[in-house]
Amino acid sequence: MKFSAITTLATFLAIVNASLCTYDDHPVNGLRYYIGAEGVPDVLGICNGFWDNVKPQCGGDWQCGQAANGDLHAEFQAYRKCLPRFINDGWWYATKNQWGSIECKLRQ
């Protein structure tokens, strides 16, 4: 599942040249967010800034870094109190939407 999520995210980003956020809602495990952006020159710096903005509301198991194709890829598990708007706002504060805005959507 992890490979398919990363592949789907990378394919989508290559098509639209933008940023993307999706999430899964698991009955037991809570929410799992997937964030991606292409063209980010300082992936580690943006990852750290983004997580600094999101961590107070969301906490959780966090992974963020550069994908094999060079794009930023982040994913993390959080409790249901971690609303999509916290992610959207955290991205804006970290990037000022320089690589596109995100609006987290539930995966169907």
State what each model feature region is:
Residues 1-20:
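Fungal secretory targeting signals
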Residues 11-14, 40, 51, 57, ...:
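Residue-level signal for mature regions of secreted extracellular proteins and peptides
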